[in-house]
């Protein structure tokens, strides 16, 4: 507006004045709505859209995103606490990432969050914690595909990596997890 940066129809200088100075963060709810709507329009209906809380864990943003997305992806107990404080249904939360600490697994299992297990060891730890808590852990397995992603700049497939279980080991691990009583959530 008038040659100045505008966010949500308001000039940056007006927002700075209202906030009482800088630095400040400004988010446009209308733009968040539009971006999610654009993404949904570009995808087949059967594809769900999850919000990665690590992208922006600000509680006001999380609360705004709640009706727009199908679920939430977290990578820490701190992010789980933000979603719990916002009243997000734990059935809509999945916890991914390597190196989950014991207390993080315990908090997630107690809350009823889906764990995306990165290894057989993490699955075993989750099952043991679930048994100790008297709760069936909700488990999915993160698959490390046996092919290399070409041209994407990503290096997450094609052999042993820190993210996920190698594809050839997934069937046995899935049978084991299901056989030990976990609530199977998928791949």
Q: For the regions a protein language model found, what residue spans apply to each?
A:
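Active-site loop/helix belt of alpha/beta enzymes
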Residues: 129, 145-187
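Glycine-rich, aromatic-flanked loop segments that form ligand/cofactor-binding clefts
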Residues: 134-148
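A charged N-terminal "starter" segment
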Residues: 1-131, 135-137, 160, 179, ...
């Amino acid at each position: 507006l008038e040659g100045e940066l505008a966010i949500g129809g308001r000039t940056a200088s007006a927002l700075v004045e209202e906030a009482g100075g800088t630095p400040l963060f400004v988010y446009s709810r209308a733009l968040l709505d539009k971006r999610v709507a654009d993404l949904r329009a570009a995808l087949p209906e059967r594809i769900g859209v999850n919000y990665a809380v690590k992208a922006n864990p600000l509680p006001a943003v999380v609360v705004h995103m709640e009706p727009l997305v199908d679920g939430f992806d977290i990578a820490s107990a701190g992010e789980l606490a933000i979603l719990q404080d916002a009243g997000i249904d734990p059935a809509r939360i999945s916890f991914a990432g390597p190196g989950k600490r014991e207390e993080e697994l315990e908090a997630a299992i107690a809350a009823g969050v889906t764990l995306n297990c990165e290894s057989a060891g993490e699955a075993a730890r989750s099952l043991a914690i679930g048994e100790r808590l008297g709760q069936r852990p909700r488990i999915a397995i993160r698959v490390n595909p046996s092919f290399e992603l070409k041209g994407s700049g990503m290096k997450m497939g094609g052999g042993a990596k820190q993210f996920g279980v190698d594809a050839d080991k997934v069937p046995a691990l899935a049978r084991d997890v299901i056989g030990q009583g976990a609530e199977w959530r998928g791949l």
